[in-house]
Amino acid sequence: MNWMELSIVVNHEVEYDVTEILESYGSNGVVIEDSNILEEQPVDKFGEIYDLNPEDYPEKGVRLKAYFNEFTYNENLKSNINYEILSLQQIDKTIYDYQEKLIAEVDWENEWKNYFHPFRASKQFTIVPSWESYVKENDNELCIELDPGMAFGTGDHPTTSMCLKAIETFVKPTDSVIDVGTGSGILSIASHLLGVQRIKALDIDEMAVNVAKENFKKNHCDDAIEAVPGNLLKNENEKFNIVIANILAHIIEEMIEDTYNTLIEDGYFITSGIIEEKYQDIESQMKRIGFKIISVEHDNGWVCIVGQKVSG
């Protein structure tokens, strides 16, 4: 299968709005190339300074690269995306640029390897690409071996990083966990590394489920995690201590009540994928359903909310 890569340059003020527009139309992830990074002295997570190629970044603003299945991307979709972006109140049309490039799936997989290197995603978790070797810094470090393939969730995005930190804080070995929209499976693997014995990973995309299963094998936990296709929690009859969902805000809104019903008493809902402009609506709806808000974390325009199921 081939993929259509959209390369869209916009001003910083609309970066998060455009990201949400692209994802709402079905983009399988968004890569961000920010011109501001060229003004910094790049240092990786291990303190090593490296050089950036200015040709990889726009002269102004930010370049968003989005990827669509070649069978779903068409002129109508292109027109709708263009219309919504150009309708944004803060859009700077003087730097706006929209380019298309058809990429073969094998090229896509190699593209990820150029950007993906070992890094510490949280206090305990280090993400290690499956094609690279890595030596742990200490015995407390938990390494997640990952090959994102055609699914997303590498740990470097603020939403995934915040979820990993929340998992460190709220998930106990005695808990049961259901990971909704598992993607690469990273959050399920993290839960397993903390000692959780019962984990279920759901994703509506069967390709993502297959990628997650491969990553579970790489981390020697494929027998410990049930990975299945699923549409949110609509047909879920089991109860869990923890529900994790790192997905888009409008999808989170759809599943809040089902999440409450899926949790046992005092269970936690860890959710991210929420932009700043939407988090208060999500928080209000969670409270209305019956959640007590335990934690709200902000990172670079994104928000992670942790709610606890309480009665009365």
Swiss-Prot record:
Its main location: cytoplasm. CDD domains: AdoMet_MTases (cd02440). Keywords: Cytoplasm, Methyltransferase, S-adenosyl-L-methionine, Transferase. S-adenosyl-L-methionine binds at residues 160, 181, 203, 246. The keyword Iron does not apply. GO terms for cellular component: cytoplasm. InterPro entries: Ribosomal_L11_MeTrfase_PrmA (IPR050078), Ribosomal_PrmA_MeTrfase (IPR004498), SAM-dependent_MTases_sf (IPR029063). It catalyses: L-lysyl-[protein] + 3 S-adenosyl-L-methionine = N(6),N(6),N(6)-trimethyl-L-lysyl-[protein] + 3 S-adenosyl-L-homocysteine + 3 H(+). It holds the Pfam family PrmA. Its EC number is 2.1.1.-. It comes from the Bacteria. GO terms for molecular function: protein-lysine N-methyltransferase activity. It is an enzyme of class 2 (transferase). It is found in: Cytoplasm. GO terms for biological process: methylation. Methylates ribosomal protein L11. Belongs to the methyltransferase superfamily. PrmA family. This is Ribosomal protein L11 methyltransferase. It comes from Staphylococcus epidermidis (strain ATCC 35984 / DSM 28319 / BCRC 17069 / CCUG 31568 / BM 3577 / RP62A).
